[in-house]
Amino acid sequence: MCICINCNHITKCNTYHLIESQHKQPHLTRSPLFIPKYPVVHVNISNNCTYNQIDWDLVECLSFVEKPNSWNLDAN
């Protein structure tokens, strides 16, 4: 699971912006300026007979600052 959803920096993080792109999701920020320190992204590839699925998860980051529910912009 991507730890970004509970990070205070989610709306301005350029690594999360990349993950949004890989998941073909709308961006929280058009031009994120925050560059996290030492993010670790796991890329999981699942093969099915009819398609391949790729899941990108940021699992570790020295810049992580916990703020539960940060992804929910309506709650902030």
From Swiss-Prot:
GO cellular component: chloroplast
UniProtKB keywords: Chloroplast, Plastid
Main localization, broad class: plastid
Compartments it resides in: Plastid, Chloroplast
Name of this protein: Uncharacterized protein ycf34
Origin species: Pyropia yezoensis
Gene of this entry: ycf34
